[in-house]
C-alpha cells in the first residue's frame, strides 16, 4: 500500500490518500487538544497508544458484528482504514452524567443514567459542535432517517459490547462519542475509539482515566491511557 498526499489534518490525526481509492491511512499524532482546539500540547507516546488502543477496540467491535472502517495496523502510529463518506454528526451515548450534560442540565456528576441516553451533535468546531436532533439531521441533509436509525442501533450495540469489556477490566464506561460514514452503501463506524473520545473511570475509586485528565489539569494523562490499555490487554 503506497502512502500518498495528506488529505486532511485534524486536531490529533492526519489522513493520507493511498494508491487504493477505497483505502486511507490514519496517522495518530502526539497532539492533544481541548476546548475545540484552543489548547494544544504534545504528549509523548500518545499517538502510539491511541493507534493501538483503537485497533484493539475496533477488532472487538467487528467480532461483535459492528462494521468498522478499520482494516489493519501499519505501524506504531498508523493504520489502514476504509475510505468512508462521513456523516457530519457525532453520536454520544451516556451511561453516567458527566461533561457537557452536567453543565447543560445542572445535574450531579456521576449519576447513573437508566436508560442510557443517546444524543446527536453537529460536527462543527466553529460553532462548538452544537446539540441537534434527528429532524435537524434530515432537514438539513446531513443524513437520512434510515441512516439515523442504523447509527443509533449501532451506537447502542457498541455501548453494550464495550460496557462489558471495560467493566471486566474494572472500569466504568461513562460516555463516548462515535462517528459514522457510508462505505459502498453500508453505514460503518468511522474515526476512532480511544480515551480521547470517551470517559472512563476506575470502578472502585472513580478516578478519571481519560482525556478529562488533560482538560482538567489532573496530570499523568498518558500514564492513565496506558493503565487502561494494560487492563484491557492491549499490546502496546
Swiss-Prot record:
Could you mention a single GO BP entry for this protein? Answer: 'de novo' IMP biosynthetic process
This entry's Enzyme Commission designation comes to 6.3.2.6
Q: Name one GO cellular component term.
A: cytosol
InterPro entries for this protein: SAICAR_synt/ADE2_N, SAICAR_synt_PurC, SAICAR_synth, SAICAR_synthetase, SAICAR_synthetase_CS
**Organism superkingdom:** Bacteria
Which EC class heads this enzyme's classification? ligase
According to its UniProt record, which reaction does this protein catalyse? 5-amino-1-(5-phospho-D-ribosyl)imidazole-4-carboxylate + L-aspartate + ATP = (2S)-2-[5-amino-1-(5-phospho-beta-D-ribosyl)imidazole-4-carboxamido]succinate + ADP + phosphate + 2 H(+)
Q: Does the keyword Metal-binding apply?
A: no
* MF GO annotations: ATP binding; phosphoribosylaminoimidazolesuccinocarboxamide synthase activity
Question: What keywords are assigned to this protein?
Answer: ATP-binding, Ligase, Nucleotide-binding, Purine biosynthesis
List the PROSITE patterns hit by this protein, alphabetically.
SAICAR_SYNTHETASE_1, SAICAR_SYNTHETASE_2
Q: In which pathway does it act?
A: Purine metabolism; IMP biosynthesis via de novo pathway; 5-amino-1-(5-phospho-D-ribosyl)imidazole-4-carboxamide from 5-amino-1-(5-phospho-D-ribosyl)imidazole-4-carboxylate: step 1/2
Q: Which family does it belong to?
A: Belongs to the SAICAR synthetase family.
Instruction: Write down the PANTHER family for this protein, in alphabetical order.
Output: MULTIFUNCTIONAL PROTEIN ADE2, SI:DKEY-6E2.2
User: What is the protein name for this chain?
Assistant: Phosphoribosylaminoimidazole-succinocarboxamide synthase
Taxonomic classification: Bacteria, Pseudomonadati, Pseudomonadota, Gammaproteobacteria, Pseudomonadales
